[in-house]
């Protein structure tokens, strides 16, 4: 599975964080609604939504 460097860096920061949820903004464009399939493919979680035209995934 290919990860862009920004997503990989964000995942590293999220995994080291002691705080709750972490947001990962992808480069995938969207037009409202859920980004579950994108988030599942990009970071392995199904939690995500479209914010400002980009899919944002949430990792606990």
Curated annotation (Swiss-Prot):
Gene3D superfamilies: Knottin, scorpion toxin-like (3.30.30.10)
UniProt site (Aromatic residue of the functional dyad): 58
Range of residues in the leader sequence: 1-22
The keyword Signal is annotated on this UniProt entry: yes
Modified residues (Pyrrolidone carboxylic acid): 23
GO cellular component, one term: extracellular region
Subcellular location: Secreted
GO molecular function (one): toxin activity
Tissues where this protein is expressed: Expressed by the venom gland.
Disulfide bonds: 30-50, 35-55, 39-57
Feature type site, description Basic residue of the functional dyad: 49
Keywords assigned by UniProt, alphabetized: Disulfide bond, Ion channel impairing toxin, Neurotoxin, Potassium channel impairing toxin, Pyrrolidone carboxylic acid, Secreted, Signal, Toxin
Family: Belongs to the short scorpion toxin superfamily. Potassium channel inhibitor family. Alpha-KTx 15 subfamily.
General function of this protein: Blocker of A-type voltage-gated potassium channels of cerebellar granular cells. May also inhibit Kv4/KCND when coexpressed with DPP6 or DPP10. The occlusion of the outer entry of the K(+) conducting pore is partially reversible and affects both open and closed channels. It shares the same target in rat brain than BmTX3 (AC Q8I0L5) and AmmTX3 (AC P60208). Also shows a weak inhibition on Kv1.2/KCNA2 and Kv1.3/KCNA3 voltage-gated potassium channels.
UniProt remark on domains: Has the structural arrangement of an alpha-helix connected to a beta-sheet by disulfide bonds (CSalpha/beta).
Annotated protein name in UniProt: Potassium channel toxin alpha-KTx 15.8
The organism's taxonomic lineage, starting at the top: Eukaryota, Metazoa, Ecdysozoa, Arthropoda, Chelicerata
